[in-house]
């Protein structure tokens, strides 16, 4: 037998990774079921008049032909006619013909998939199998009653095979798929078959379910005639009042996976199935009479094949039909096996969910399994409802059995284990053994892994921080319709506000991971960024429908990367990203090391970037240039780690360095080299030369190129002041002597023309730069000269056209320093040729926002607004950098980009 403390072999064990249910009363979810059974509540009610007119069928004598001897049962509270047909791609005409069992199975299948953290898009085409236990076909009787008015799709709407096949069809599952009818053991048999397909390698994932609804008296009358059903409509499991079972309706659904695979994929393991087995009674005194011998044989066989002893099993979820004969037979089997070696003062605990929700027949086994999973998770055993005095045929003390009447603690030390037993009215028995999950996952995962955690092989993007520090997190939401996104957000707000589960950073991290990485993707999407429970709930609550956007119809939206030039730098830029994202941090550290070791830098780049404002010299050209480029490249690396790649790129002035790197046209070492010497040469020029003409400034002006050139000509300053950058049809940057720039700025102020003097002490793209042209080229003479096409086209702001040759040459980068910046032309050509869906600015600030808006207005004026690409900025000064980057990723994701969110959550 086994040694639980040294258990290693998990090859044959099966993990329960997801479950959902629609059971009677308030047990509409596993948590709802737990609340019901914990409090000994029942879902019994009188039979609703919209199901059966009991005045026409009730008679206390169950032997009376055509009568029913009870007035109550256990029903779902929901309207069975309500069904989200569109979500499941079902037409209105098909939906009318569909058995409610099919509808409920579809709904619970989706909920179980979500609970398992699986995504619909990953299931399509897989070998996932589906097994459904079923017993009744009430809807077929109802819908086919009138031969002259039968639904067109009645064959597929009521066919028993379609209960399983409909699920396989909707999700495009290509593993085994079948409906199983063994009477009331059907769904536990379905679970057994699901486990077998996993054990034999036929499937990688298996769905198992059971279903049943009560719609017609025609099913009840034959069962009444055979004394199956209680005249009280209730189940009194193990009780002296046992007089038949009380019917119930509902659906239970579980998702199963081999334990080794579930551990590998970091799935949320709810419990572990150690063994399952089925057998048949054979000949008994009557076909509906159960057999103690057969059940003993099955229980013993399942434990033997699993290599387990009976000693560690503390609880048995029995079939517990509530018939005196059936209860006696089953409890005798439990006594002869699981309880045989128990001390009398330590009996095995037995229970049944049937008094709470009724006998669900085809769904009874899966209901017992879901209850058992909850018992293992909670570590307590709930009291038995409808139990007062034990069945007089059962000597509970002699049998070493106990029926709990109050919530009780787990009676045995160590591993928690339960058994589930079922038997069908035709003699098919089923048994399953479940272990708690914790024992099997302990030591298999890193200590920080939550209920849902990222795949172990995923690249680490995040920097580890103190879990007590609130970290901004991205939370994504998706739905097939726009209103659905907002509705889900508001529901999450209520849940987060009302629960104690989201008090720490780790809790929010787990939620972020689940929403971002373990949820199916639909057309409509929305996102929020928050770092506390309160902020998250408040932001979700305040979200309106306009924040939900529809993804682009193109499978992979095209993203143009845009890079600003000098003047965007500021003290501490990138510091928040440095402390949050490992990819960004590594990129800056590598740049710093390269500048020090290979380029002879006299400063530590990282130190200069992280300096506080009072100590910062970030505006010195020798520092600002390599720092800005390093920040831009770090953002590129971060985006690429999240699977965000450019379809094209445009750089403004020195922004072309990072643009060429992003497109794969130059190496990162070459990019750092170009930026380092660009800054060094610009600074040396101002130091080496003297005189007022060497003091340079730049100024951005809201004026067209033609108007500005005319203005400079009229003022006779075109020799000392040049149009350095054509940013957009409405904006230019002028550059030249500082004194002239200040005079023009004063005049523009008087004329109420918007302008802004840039925070750069050098007149880039003016005649000043001719003094360092040769020196800069000499510094770059060792750059590779062979043209590399890269992974995406770059559109040059030096030539105003697509880059074909020369980006690796020193001549090109000297022109980039000295020539006018034709950003507007480059953008227009890029938009015409590349047709991007999104424009993503990468830099310390969103300096290009206004220019891009002007260009888009000029190009798309008079056209439909959705033809213009959407602008997104990775960073914006004044905003938390992590918020900005996460918001940018959320924006890209919302528009249909396949953003890899795996590394954005702390592991």
Segments from the language model and where they lie:
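Active-site machinery of serine-nucleophile hydrolases
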Residues: 563-611
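Short Gly/Thr/Asp-enriched flexible loops that form oxyanion-binding sites at enzyme active sites
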Residues: 325-333, 845-862
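Short, low-complexity connector segments at domain boundaries
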Residues: 1-22, 58-59, 64-66, 80, ...
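Flexible, low-complexity linker/boundary loops enriched in proline and small hydrophobic residues
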Residues: 17, 67, 71-79, 405, ...
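Condensing-enzyme catalytic core of the thiolase-fold
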Residues: 2-461, 616, 637, 667-670, ...
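Flexible catalytic loop/linker elements that gate and position reactive groups at enzyme active sites
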Residues: 19-22, 41-42, 290-305, 419-559, ...
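Short beta-alpha connecting loops at secondary-structure transitions
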Residues: 148-152, 180, 235-243, 280-286, ...
């Amino acid at each position: 037998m086994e040694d639980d403390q040294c258990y290693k072999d998990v090859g044959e064990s099966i993990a329960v990774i997801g479950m959902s249910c629609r059971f009677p009363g308030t047990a509409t979810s596993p948590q709802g079921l737990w609340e019901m059974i914990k409090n000994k509540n029942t879902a019994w009610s009188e039979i609703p008049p919209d199901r059966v007119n009991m005045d026409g069928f009730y008679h206390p004598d169950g032997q009376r032909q055509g009568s029913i001897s009870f007035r109550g049962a256990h029903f779902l509270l929901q309207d069975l006619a309500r069904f989200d047909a569109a979500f499941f791609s079902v037409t209105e005409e098909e939906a009318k013909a569909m058995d409610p069992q099919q509808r409920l199975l579809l709904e619970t299948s989706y909920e179980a998939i979500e609970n398992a953290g699986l995504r619909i898009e990953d299931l399509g085409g897989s070998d996932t199998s589906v097994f459904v236990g079923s017993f009744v076909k009430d809807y077929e009787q109802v819908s086919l009653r009138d031969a002259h008015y039968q639904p067109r799709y009645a064959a597929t709407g009521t066919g028993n095979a379609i209960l399983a096949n409909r699920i396989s069809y909707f999700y495009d599952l290509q593993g085994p798929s079948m409906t199983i009818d063994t009477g009331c053991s059907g769904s536990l048999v379905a679970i057994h078959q699901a486990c077998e397909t996993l054990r034999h390698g036929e499937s990688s994932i298996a769905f198992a379910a059971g279903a049943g609804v009560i719609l017609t008296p025609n099913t009840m009358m034959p069962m009444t005639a055979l004394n199956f059903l209680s005249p009280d409509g209730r189940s009194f499991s193990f009780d002296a009042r046992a007089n038949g079972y009380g019917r119930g309706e509902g659906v239970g659904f579980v998702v199963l996976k081999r334990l080794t695979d579930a551990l590998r994929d970091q799935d949320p393991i709810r419990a572990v199935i150690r063994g399952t087995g089925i057998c048949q009674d054979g000949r008994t005194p009557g076909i509906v009479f159960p057999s103690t011998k057969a059940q003993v044989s099955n229980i013993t066989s399942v434990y033997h094949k699993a290599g387990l002893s009976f000693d560690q099993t503390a609880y048995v979820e029995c079939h517990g039909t509530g018939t005196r004969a059936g209860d006696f037979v089953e409890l005798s089997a439990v006594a002869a096996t699981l309880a045989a070696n128990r001390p009398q003062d330590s009996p095995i605990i037995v229970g049944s969910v049937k008094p709470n929700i009724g006998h669900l027949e085809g769904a009874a086994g899966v209901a017992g399994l879901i209850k058992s999973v909850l018992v293992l998770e909670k570590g307590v055993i709930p009291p038995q409802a409808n139990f007062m005095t034990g069945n007089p045929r059962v000597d509970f003390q002699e049998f070493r059995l106990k029926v709990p009447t109050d919530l009780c603690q787990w009676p045995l030390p160590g591993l928690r284990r339960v058994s589930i037993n079922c038997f069908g009215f035709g003699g098919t028995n089923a048994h399953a053994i479940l272990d708690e999950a914790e024992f099997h996952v302990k030591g298999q995962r890193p200590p920080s892994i939550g209920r849902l955690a990222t795949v172990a092989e995923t690249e680490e993007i995040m920097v580890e921080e103190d879990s007590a520090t609130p970290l901004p997190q991205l939370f994504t939401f998706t739905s097939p319709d726009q209103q659905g996104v907002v509705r889900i957000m508001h529901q999450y707000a209520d849940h987060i506000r009302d629960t104690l589960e989201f008090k720490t950073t780790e809790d929010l991290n787990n939620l972020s991971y689940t929403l971002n990485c373990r949820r199916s993707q639909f057309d409509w999407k929305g996102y929020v960024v928050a770092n506390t429970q309160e902020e998250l709930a408040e932001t979700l609550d305040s979200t309106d429908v306009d924040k939900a956007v529809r993804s682009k119809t193109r499978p992979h939206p095209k993203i143009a990367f845009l890079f600003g030039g000098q003047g965007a730098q500021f003290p501490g830029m990138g510091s928040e990203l440095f402390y949050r994202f490992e990819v960004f941090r590594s990129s800056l550290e590598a740049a710093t090391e390269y500048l020090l070791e290979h380029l002879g830098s006299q400063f530590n780049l990282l130190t200069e970037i992280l300096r506080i404002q009072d100590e910062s010299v970030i505006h010195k050209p020798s520092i600002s240039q390599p720092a800005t480029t390093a920040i831009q490249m770090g953002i590129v690396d971060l985006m690429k780690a999240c699977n965000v790649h450019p379809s094209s790129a445009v750089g403004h002035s020195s922004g072309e360095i990072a643009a060429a790197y992003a497109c794969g046209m130059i190496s990162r070492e070459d990019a750092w080299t170009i930026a380092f010497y660009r800054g060094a040469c610009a600074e040396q020029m101002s130091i080496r030369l003297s005189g007022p003409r060497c003091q340079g400034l730049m100024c951005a002006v809201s004026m067209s190129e033609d108007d500005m050139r005319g203005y400079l000509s009229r003022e006779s300053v075109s020799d000392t002041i040049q149009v350095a950058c054509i940013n957009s049809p409405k904006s230019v940057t002028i550059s030249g002597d500082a004194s002239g720039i200040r005079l023009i700025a004063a005049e523009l102020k008087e004329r109420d023309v918007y302008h802004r003097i840039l925070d750069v002490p050098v007149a880039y793209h003016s005649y000043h730069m001719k003094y360092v042209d040769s020196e800069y080229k000499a510094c770059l003479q060792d750059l590779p000269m062979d043209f590399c096409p890269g992974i995406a086209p770059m559109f040059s702001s030096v030539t105003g056209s697509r880059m074909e040759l020369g980006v690796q040459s020193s001549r090109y980068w000297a022109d980039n320093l000295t020539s006018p910046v034709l950003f507007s032309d480059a953008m227009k050509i890029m938009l015409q040729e590349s047709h991007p869906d999104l424009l993503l600015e990468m830099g310390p600030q969103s300096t290009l926002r206004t220019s891009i808006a002007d260009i888009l207005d000029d190009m798309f004026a008079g056209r439909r607004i959705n033809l213009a690409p959407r602008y997104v900025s990775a960073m914006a000064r004044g905003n938390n950098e992590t918020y900005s980057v996460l918001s940018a990723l959320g924006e890209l994701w919302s528009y249909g980009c396949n953003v890899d969110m795996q590394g954005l959550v702390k592991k």
